[in-house]
Amino acid sequence: MPLLVTSASGANGDGYGALLAFDDGGKPLGPFSDDDRIVDPRGLAPDPERRLLFLNSAERVLALDPAGEVARDSGVIAGLNPGGGIFGPDGRYYVGLRGARTVLALPPDLKRPGEHVLPPGVVPFPRGFGFGANGKLFLSSGIGPDGKGDDTIVAFSADRTRAVRLVDDPELSPLDLAVAPNGNVVVSSEHPFGALGAVTTVREYDPESGRLARVLSASGLAAFRRPRGLRFGADGNLYCAAQDEVVAFDFKAGRCLGPVVRLTRLHGQALAFFP
């Protein structure tokens, strides 16, 4: 199954500004789609039921078919400025909004307007989010391009009426968040954010107490600079997009397996296995 990675361009990274495909051995296959609506792409999430890949691109959301053709297009959504994207338990497609600093839920047909599921400005700078089995929404809050932020994870109740600061970890600066198969919250971290000598890790937290359960590091097996998007594979491994590579971790054993993709100037933002 091909591995797809969004590569940032412009002010956010000297990358390719494209959705790139790699084969099972990590060999680059070029852009998955040449559609000119794909501009400096960010989050992406597969919809296995419909065999579509949802992709956040500039001021719109696209859904691509297995051939890389655009099957659905939200049209321009003014001020979207999207970050990550995932499907929620209600079947809607959720998008992190970096400018509005909230999360938007869109219907999967992309034909109707979405709605904010959290108040605008709910965190200083959203960096990634995920849903727990009980409907909780976990939102990582990191440092923005202006250097401001609060480096934590906020947990919202299933009805979104209550919020608690879940994590107090002085060594955390989150870049993306995923909920692991064991229910724990997993975050890619670069601390201090943007620093030349930043410590890069994957950090795992208990979803109820916020207790730090484990810290995964590259252990010299990968450069692991500027870690960003996280994704669990069907093999149970955890994959993380980074500056010049995609790094795999044996999540059960808690050890790094090294890069599965190497590409100079990748500036990986998000990844998915599709179709």
Regions found by a protein language model. Name each.
Residues 1-30:
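An edge-strand/N-cap motif at the start of beta-rich repeat modules
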Residues 5, 54-55, 95-96, 139, ...:
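Conserved beta-strand element within WD40/beta-propeller blades
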Residues 8-10, 56-58, 98-99, 142-144, ...:
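Short loop/turn segments immediately following the C-termini of beta-strands
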Residues 14-16, 35-50, 58, 77-93, ...:
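Beta-rich, blade/repeat-based domains predominating
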Residues 17-20, 60-62, 101-105, 151-155, ...:
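A short loop-to-beta-strand structural motif that recurs across blades of beta-propeller domains
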Residues 23-27, 64-69, 106-111, 156-161, ...:
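Short loop/turn segments that connect beta-strands within beta-propeller blades
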Residues 27-36, 69-76, 112-120, 162-168, ...:
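A short beta-strand motif characteristic of beta-propeller blades
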Residues 243-275:
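Blade-level signature of beta-propeller repeat domains, shared across WD40, Kelch, NHL, RCC1
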